Structure formats: C-alpha cells, structure tokens
C-alpha cells in the first residue's frame, strides 16, 4: 500500500511539472502520458511515434549494446509492457490510442530526421506560428 501512495505522489509531481513546462513556454514532452495530462489545452500537438517490433528490438540492441536478439526482445517487451501498464493506469486508455492523437507516425518509414521534419510541418500547419520555422532552422 505504501508503494501505491509513493507512485501516486510521483505521478502527481509529474502532472505538475508537465503543466508547469507547458504554461511557461513552447516545449516538447516525450511520453509520460503528456497527451492525457495536457488533454484540455488547445495549444498542444499530440504525436505518437512507433516502429515495427523488429525495428524497435534492433534499436534496443544498438542503444544498449545487447548482442543476443532474444535478450534484446525480452528487454524491449519488459519496457513496452511497463509503459503500456503505466499509461493505462494513469489514463484508463491504451497507449498509442489514435483518438487522443493528432498524428501517428511509423518512424521506420521516414527515419528520425524526416519524421522530425514531418512533425515540424504539422506544428506549422496547426498553429501557423514562427516556432515551427525556428525548429526547422535548428534541425
């Protein structure tokens, strides 16, 4: 029971931090159920980036230096399962649900740079402001 209270306190602190960042200025928040936390704001673009399982496992192997595919798959499954459970606990919805997103992108098709460019273009179209133009210059 004590663990659940600690978890809820951490989640509450996370909600506060994400709202503080969003209130302060334009920002990019990766994960942390930010689509749910910022769901009542009009100035948010919710994007879910995904890739086929084999590409995600290959990324785990590269990033963590794991040479055994079975071990990399176990690592990926463990993290993926925890992320799904955490998101569902907080939101009551499945992670990656298209109904809470403006955009879903398979990053394996375009690669990271073109995926980023696509998101920047979407920001520009949705908000029609200079932040997207500045991001393009920095990319």
Each model region followed by its residue ranges:
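Short, amphipathic alpha-helical "lid/cap" segments that border enzyme active or binding sites
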Residues: 15, 112-120
């Amino acid at each position: 029971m004590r663990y659940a209270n600690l978890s809820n306190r951490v989640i509450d602190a996370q909600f506060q931090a994400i709202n503080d960042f969003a209130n302060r200025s334009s920002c990019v928040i990766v994960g942390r159920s930010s689509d749910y936390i910022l769901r009542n704001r009009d100035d948010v673009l919710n994007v879910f980036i995904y890739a086929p399982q084999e590409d995600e496992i290959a990324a785990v192997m590269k990033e963590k230096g794991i040479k055994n595919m079975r071990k990399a798959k176990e690592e990926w499954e463990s993290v993926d399962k925890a992320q799904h459970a955490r998101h569902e606990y907080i939101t009551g919805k499945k992670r990656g649900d298209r109904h809470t997103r403006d955009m879903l992108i398979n990053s394996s098709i375009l690669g990271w740079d073109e995926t980023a460019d696509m998101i920047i273009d979407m920001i520009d179209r949705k908000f029609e402001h200079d932040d997207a133009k500045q991001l393009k210059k920095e990319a």
